[in-house]
Amino acid sequence: MEQQFTWKTNDVSLVFSYGDDAPVAMIGYAVPSQGIDVRFAHAVPILEVLASGSGHWLACGKLTHTSIGKNLRYAGHRVSDAKAARQLADQDGRNETVSSWAKSNMDRLDIDLFDAETGIKATVTYEVADGAPMVRVYATVRNSGQVSSKVTLESVTSFAGSFGAPADAEPTTPETFGDWKLTEADMDWLSEGRWQTTPLRRLFPRMHEELTGWDPRGRHQVVSTGTWSTGQHAPLAVLSNDDLHLAWVFQVEHNGAWRWEVGQDTEDGYLALSGPTQEDHAWQRTLEPGDDFVTVPASFAIAKDVDGAVEDLTAYRRAWRYEHVDNAEPSVVFNDYMNTI
């Protein structure tokens, strides 16, 4: 039997579903002040984990469709106000280097998960700063030791979810997927920020996969290489749909290895954000019993159009930037693009 719960902050509301036979999924997103109310009929697990010895339940190379992600079950959730959220942030170390306005003025939600087959325990953490309607999310994965002496991780998502549609719109179909566009940036040392917009149907041709009963295997992935995290691509992109009046903005907050991807499932599109992976960066993390791993943070917002999404991103970055006197009254602006240092 499906159950639901809602997390409300001053700016953003999130709705989640779960069940004895279903993983936790985000099924609602709302920003009442902006008239945003989105529903996600296609339930994507909030956490996807690939580990040695446990692969995908659908043969593919996606960050999603992992067996562990499908098997993780709801084990509880906790809501923290601004004061408690700051105490937790100080304790868990995720924000230990962050001295910002957001750290003292954010609400926090922790969702606990458990996979009985592998003994993996996980906590997915959501944070929203007052006045910045954008959600920061990361996950902590632990080896409980109840099943295996070791668990070797090969990829762990910071965020995964479907595209969604307005609450008052018709359900999504393979045809409506073709109305989405992806805006992303290519980078080079002397040519940063080359933004281009591509209709998703150009990346994912119509295949009538619903006749097979299986989701398509393909994905559009963007990956950092080497130690230059933005040497070729940006860890930031926008998904927009003019017909639905929706626009996602999402980013991976990491100056090391990262990967983001978008793709088409039969019911709807999906996006997934992560740090390093075994496939892309030869990354692995072995967890002994009691060990844990914390993903890089990612963040996302949904607005009515691209301009609105960028406004939310700007408010978010201003809330999370380091506290400094120059934030209130900048004295010097020097745009060197790292080329003159």
Regions found by a protein language model. Give the residues of each.
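Active-site beta-loop-alpha junctions enriched in small/polar residues
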Residues: 156, 255, 298-300, 337-339
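An acidic-aromatic substrate-binding cleft motif
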Residues: 309-341
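Polysaccharide-binding surfaces and accessory modules of carbohydrate-active proteins
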Residues: 2-8, 12-16, 20, 24-264
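A residue-level signal for beta-strand positions that form part of recognition/binding surfaces
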Residues: 4, 292, 331
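Short, basic/aromatic beta-hairpin or loop at an interaction surface
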Residues: 260-274
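Short Pro-Gly-centered flexible turn/kink motifs
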Residues: 11, 285-303
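Short alpha-helix capping/helix-loop boundary micro-motifs
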Residues: 272, 277-284
